[in-house]
Amino acid sequence: MGLFLPTTKKELELRGWDYVDVILFSGDAYVDHPSFGVAVIGRTLEAAGYRVAIVPQPDWHGDYRDFTKLGRPRLFFGISPGCMDSMVNKYTAARRLRSEDAYSPDGRHDKRPEYPTIVYTKILKQLYPDVPVILGGIEASLRRLTHYDYWQDRLRPSILVDSGADMITYGMGEKVTLELARRIAEGENISDITDLPQTVFLTKTDAIPGGITDRDIVLHSHQECLRSKRAEAENYRHIEEQSNMMHAQRLIQETLPQPLPLREKGKYPQEGISTKEVSSPLPYRERLGESLYVVVNPPYPPLTTEELDASFDLPYTRLPHPKYKGHRIPAYDMIRHSVNIHRGCFGGCAFCTISAHQGKFVVCRSKESILKEVRQVTQMDDFRGYLSDLGGPSANMYGMKGRNQKACEKCRRPSCIHPLICPNLNTSHQALLDIYRAVDALPGVKKSFIGSGVRYDLLLYRGNDEAANRSAEEYTRELICHHVSGRLKVAPEHTSDRVLMLMRKPPFRQFQQFKRIFDRINREEGLRQQIIPYFISSHPGCREEDMAELAALTKDMDFQLEQVQDFTPTPMTIATETWYTGLDPYTLQPVSSAHTPQEKLAQRQYFFWYKPEERPALERSLRRIGRADLIPRLFGTQPHNSQPSHYSHPSHDNYRADPRPQKPGKEKRGRNRRHP
């Protein structure tokens, strides 16, 4: 394991450096671990011979000394908001400030501004106007084109316009960042680098490289999208398809830099610097009012196993920087003893951003690389023999890909398993079983748990490959018997097949089938494990009647739900575009959604049917929607004699709105704790 990348002038001097090639600014605390993107990019550049420094969570107030303490980099500044979109990280679905920031020391939520991508860029461009600023990370990736911002309740243009940065490197950034650094180091001007895959830049119409050709997809302009929600919906279909193609086309969208309207005081969260300052384009970029075009170059092909191994095999310390000694970083606590074994997800869930950021093609690490990292974990002072997770974006997609790759190269489907599992997909779980067994055989490993989400539709699928079918059965039993820490969490998300179709999730009967298998194996093996389902309310297409049925069905299955959340519209998902536009981007048919707090609360209340204090409001709601027949099914035949009470919003403040995973095996406490 190597030293930490330098974060201060003193640390530069200890290395004998009198300059730095690249300075990375991050909205997260600096944790030198392959699950933290800034550490990955920093180590990747370091391995290529560049001098790299990191400034984690700079103070954006006052004299900006954190932005000047390391001086001017030789090549460029890189900016990442952190592992999550800053607004998802900071606010709940109800636009309330979260109680803690999991990626900050001691969970403090005052260590990063809103939209750090914008705030950091503007400060750096003010201080160093001639130094390129490159945006990376999920916030910039998912805001690379016109997008709906839930927290401001309006369409925003590409974050390049709002920030004044020079370029976005979207998606997983190792390869593109290395190539960009090489070209700038060789003397190319950032404004001349317009052909680099997986980058986004702004240009005038007469400067679009090669001009607009038949190979390009020209999207509706930002101004058209402001006028027409249909235009925005039509755009998104192209964006999603191209994000999931092996050989994508270039996307071009006209945009118009202009000051954006001031928000009403107190109506929405306030950004770290003034709204006027954030929203106005910078004068160095182009004069106000001149039309510019956002150009999104197609991505690189997926990494090879060898390239992915190289990224994970870099000399990470796997620890928070020593500056945080005595402070707890909650997100690190969750992953300190976990190992990521693949990237990408072909699930294509409507509310998920993974395919837009990592793509649908699964890239796997080699067994040797995985075992090497597990051995490192076993040497950690606080390791007691239990790995918290061997997984990835999904627990059981390791080693899966299309049998005929030529067919995959032409495919436009955003999901390989919805609405039906593609017959070309190799669904064998054998490679994953081999990984589990090899890990569990290592000295020092007592047990490896699976904390990532399990796709039970892949476990239930029976195709023409009998070996793959047998491996799914074998995996199911091994998972339940040896890799569950008492509670297996899965995500049916809803019970209505109509809503599930919009979510791109399998029918609810598959969850019921999987639960029967889970219960049977528990009986056969003498286990007393629980299956914990996740559910979402207020997803586009979901009606109050659907939530009433959800309450009745889950009650019949003896669940008292705890892992629940309200749908949060986040940039660049089909669910968000449907929620905002009211249209399905693929069919352009209308889809209704719950928008107001009252409409959302009316749906969310059904999660908590088992709480006596909620019964009066639920009975009134069931009668109002014409489903009084569900009252005896939920509450029995005994009438409720208490006086009607006004339904109180704070009674649901503790529902699970946080999309971040909990530590595997951790018992939920408080009002949503499952009763024995």
What are these model-derived regions, one by one?
Residues 2-19, 29, 244, 250-252, ...:
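N-terminal [4Fe-4S]-dependent radical SAM core
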Residues 14, 22-26, 68, 196-199, ...:
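Flexible, glycine-rich loop/tail regions that form catalytic "lids" or insertion modules at the edges
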Residues 24, 40, 54, 60, ...:
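Conserved SAM/AdoMet-binding glycine-rich loop
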Residues 25-28, 325-353, 386:
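N-terminal pre-triad scaffold of radical SAM enzymes
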Residues 37, 56-252, 288-290:
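Glycine-rich beta-alpha loop elements in corrinoid/cobalamin-binding modules
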Residues 61, 191-214, 222-244, 300-303, ...:
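Terminal amphipathic helices with adjacent charged low-complexity linkers/tails
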Residues 85-94, 142-144, 174-179, 361, ...:
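Flexible glycine/acidic-rich beta-alpha junction loops that bind and position SAM and/or redox cofactors
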Residues 263-265, 271, 286:
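Glycine-biased, low-complexity coil/linker segments
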